[in-house]
Amino acid sequence: MAAAPQAPGRGSVRKTRPLPVKTSLNNPYSICWGVLDREDMHFILQTLEDRIQSLGLQKIEDRKRKKKQPPLKKQSGDTSSIDVDTGEDLKKEKPKGDAQASGWTPVDVRKQLAIGINEVTRALERNELLLALACKSAKPAIVTSHLVQLSVSRGVPACQVPRLSERLAPVLGLKCVLALGFKRNTTAFGEELRAILPRVPRLNVAWLQDALEDPRENLQTESLESQDEEILDTSFEDLSKPKRKLAEGQQPVVLQPLKIKKLIPNPNKIRKPPKSKRTASK
């Protein structure tokens, strides 16, 4: 005999909600810092540390905080006199502590530097730097990775220096120094930059090959007279030629294939229903 059909259950079957999948395209180019030699790393750190110490550049912070004094108890005349004496002593000691004002000691030298990721980023956007240094201890690495494209687009030499924050932060009186930039108007670090720039490795960004320059070439700046003579020597035919020609020995930019990347959340995660559905089920 055939089995009798079963009556459908009273409770409604709960449908599983499909997991949201985020689809995006990956980045085919790998952006990375140039490899700095160990000897060059020690030379850069030692040179900057010695120069900063000789200039006396340091940030002084007033760490003395006013401690809350307990309420005065009126017990006898002796205690009140003691409290008055201690108050007068504190007033006398305050001017001694405030004699050394908080802030940067040589303000003019501080204006020649860009300290911190935000300052270095803004200075690179305005094309105000001669050299940009980033600390390798910055985590996550994406915090300083944008400095690679920025520095190459502006033609500014940049490199990642290990132990930059560990060596320079105590000298500057800061907790950490994740990025350091030297502005174009610097006069206090002129000789140091001439010695450091040849040791900076060259950065490689695939879509910014025209902006790449050798740091050593930046040291030998041409005079305005020589530039004017070259412009006068160029004929009208040379100026009328199309400018979009690859230089000799320059490799053309090759388009890389893109891959579709899907981000799927964890399916094993226990997701609680919203409060509105909880109250409806009850």
From Swiss-Prot:
List localization entries: Nucleus, Nucleolus
Concerning its family, UniProt says: Belongs to the eukaryotic ribosomal protein eL8 family.
Gene that encodes it:
RPP38
Give the organism the record lists: Bos taurus (Bovine)
**Which residues, renumbered to this chain, carry the PTM N-acetylalanine?**
A2
Modified sites of kind Phosphoserine = S12, S226, S235
Keyword S-adenosyl-L-methionine included in the entry's annotation: no
State where composition is biased (Basic residues): 269-282
Supply one GO CC term from the record: nucleolar ribonuclease P complex
Q: Name one GO molecular function term.
A: ribonuclease P RNA binding
* Main subcellular location: nucleus
List, alphabetically, the Gene3D superfamilies matched.
Answer: 3.30.1330.30
> Compositionally biased, Basic and acidic residues: which spans?
88-97
Report the protein's function: Component of ribonuclease P, a ribonucleoprotein complex that generates mature tRNA molecules by cleaving their 5'-ends. Also a component of the MRP ribonuclease complex, which cleaves pre-rRNA sequences.
Coiled-coil regions listed in the entry:
none
Assembly information from the UniProt record:
Component of nuclear RNase P and RNase MRP ribonucleoproteins. RNase P consists of a catalytic RNA moiety and about 10 protein subunits; POP1, POP4, POP5, POP7, RPP14, RPP21, RPP25, RPP30, RPP38 and RPP40. Within the RNase P complex, POP1, POP7 and RPP25 form the 'finger' subcomplex, POP5, RPP14, RPP40 and homodimeric RPP30 form the 'palm' subcomplex, and RPP21, POP4 and RPP38 form the 'wrist' subcomplex. All subunits of the RNase P complex interact with the catalytic RNA. Several subunits of RNase P are also part of the RNase MRP complex.
What protein is this chain from?
Ribonuclease P protein subunit p38
- Per the UniProt entry, what are the Gene Ontology biological process annotations, in alphabetical order? rRNA processing; tRNA 5'-leader removal
Q: Keywords on this record?
A: Acetylation, Nucleus, Phosphoprotein, rRNA processing, tRNA processing
